[in-house]
Amino acid sequence: MHCPFCFAVDTKVIDSRLVGEGSSVRRRRQCLVCNERFTTFEVAELVMPRVVKSNDVREPFNEEKLRSGMLRALEKRPVSSDDVEMAISHIKSQLRATGEREVPSKMIGNLVMEQLKKLDKVAYIRFASVYRSFEDIKEFGEEIARLED
């Protein structure tokens, strides 16, 4: 790695530690030319599959879109942001685990509902009502009855 101070090519690693629950590595480095020290962070670059929408349009996976949809359903609900981030991380892991280059948006919606059901039943119903386009109160009741089973 190049030194950010003198741009020399040779640096050595002084210390390495796992951070972020083991998902990245923090390294302290020292330049062999100017002796300045600096910190770098290393994370695996994990490619997310592309999303195939119901109208066959393909678009890159958008984590912000996933997060905003979940947060909208969870609005004013007693769920911590850490729990939301863990759920998002779990969904992304499941999508990568498919090994597919493209996944249908329907799969993502189902994974979101699965996570919301674990986090907060009210948020799950909110999301399901929009995602499944509930038409009347009867459909809400049927979904709530399924939750109680």
UniProtKB/Swiss-Prot annotation:
GO biological process: negative regulation of DNA-templated transcription
Note on cofactor: Binds 1 zinc ion.
Entry keyword set: ATP-binding, DNA-binding, Metal-binding, Nucleotide-binding, Repressor, Transcription, Transcription regulation, Zinc, Zinc-finger
Name of a matching Pfam family: Zn_ribbon_NrdR
Residue span(s) of domain ATP-cone: 49-139
Alphabetized GO MF terms: ATP binding; DNA binding; zinc ion binding
unnamed Zn finger ranges: 3-34
Keyword Zinc in record: yes
Coiled coil region boundaries: none
Record keyword DNA repair present: no
Cofactor(s) demanded: Zn(2+)
Domain of life: Bacteria
Function: Negatively regulates transcription of bacterial ribonucleotide reductase nrd genes and operons by binding to NrdR-boxes.
Protein family: Belongs to the NrdR family.
Matching NCBIfam families: transcriptional regulator NrdR (TIGR00244)
Protein name according to UniProt: Transcriptional repressor NrdR
Species annotation: Escherichia fergusonii (strain ATCC 35469 / DSM 13698 / CCUG 18766 / IAM 14443 / JCM 21226 / LMG 7866 / NBRC 102419 / NCTC 12128 / CDC 0568-73)
Lineage: Bacteria, Pseudomonadati, Pseudomonadota, Gammaproteobacteria, Enterobacterales
